[in-house]
Regions:
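Short linear motifs at protein or domain termini
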Residues: 1-32, 38, 42, 163, ...
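Short, highly charged C-terminal tails/helix-capping segments
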Residues: 158-172
């Protein structure tokens, strides 16, 4: 399709060359998902609200892989409930681009109990606002959620980079180095 060829593929190439582009996509998601949440609060049908709720409940899975997949479905269900095909297709494209690079980060977020708890509370706040038709509340809740995701992913990446630097240091940080220096 046109969007696959002209949007998704070039972004996938950028992501393959430099995974930090995922943060650029996350910034774009702020604008798009805030809008999908706003429109979903105004337009969601009872059936769409039920689908959003079911996707949310699936994010509570103890299996981090299933929970992270359900997280994607949750966000896409909100986009579907916005009744805006451009927003929905854009969201689908973003998740297609991010699928491989962010899957690991999503799984890590779901493995850390305090992070998992905060994600759950944030998702619930988005749902609550959508279900009562509070468009501004839904937009704000989604922006707060994505801000938290952005901060958490950056922290995980920084921790991973710090760990990689430490393991490359020579010296007495591990048993094998001490034995060689003795």
């Amino acid at each position: 399709t046109w969007s696959e060829q002209n949007i998704v593929q070039p972004l996938k190439t950028l992501m393959a060359d430099d995974p930090d582009y995922s943060f650029d996509i996350l910034e774009a998601r702020y604008a798009i998902e805030a809008s999908t949440a706003w429109h979903a609060a105004m337009r969601a049908t009872p059936g769409e609200k039920e689908k959003i709720q079911l996707c949310f409940e699936a994010t509570l899975s103890e299996d981090p892989d299933l929970a992270s997949q359900a997280d994607v479905r949750f966000h896409l269900a909100i986009a579907e409930a916005s009744h805006n095909i451009v927003l929905l297709q854009t969201m689908r494209g973003f998740f297609d681009v991010l699928q491989s690079s962010v899957k690991h980060s999503r799984q890590r977020m779901y493995l850390v109990p305090p992070v998992f708890s905060q994600l759950t509370e944030q998702h619930q706040a988005v749902i609550d606002a959508i279900f009562v038709g509070d468009a501004d509340g839904a937009r704000k809740a989604m922006m707060a959620h994505l801000s938290f995701v952005h901060t958490t992913m950056k922290r995980f990446d920084e921790d991973q980079a710090r760990h990689a630097r430490i393991t490359r240091l020579p010296g007495d940080h591990n048993e094998h180095s001490r034995e060689k220096n003795a």
